[in-house]
Amino acid sequence: MGQLVHITDESFEQETRGEMPVLVDFWAEWCGPCRMVAPVLEQIATEQVGKLRIVKLNVDENQHTPMHFGVSGIQTMILFKDGQAVERIVGFMPKPQLMKRLQPHLSAATPTPTA
């Protein structure tokens, strides 16, 4: 089962490296849209195990990373692949629209069968 992992400025680089896409949810306790998207992200994390990791970074407790990536407002999500930002999503988005934005990046993450 997929699970949302909470990361920090210190663990950010390690958590977003690698071939598997990583969606970083930049959030805060007081952010209404962040609370609205949380159950959607939990569903996606469960459904996309092995294709996508979803992590959460609290912008009130970790200010360096959002500043580095120009996150000026939340709710913001950035999709990383091989440590590089490949997609930025700002504002609440229902699951079908969110998956439409993520899907092109997930197909490349499908594991290759071994003989």
Question: What is the meaning of each model-derived region?
Answer:
Residues 78-111:
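Non-catalytic, surface beta->alpha helical segment in thiol-disulfide oxidoreductase systems
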Residues 26-40:
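Conserved redox-active cysteine motifs that mediate thiol-disulfide chemistry
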Residues 19-20, 27-30, 73:
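Short pre-active-site segment immediately N-terminal to redox-active cysteine/selenocysteine motifs
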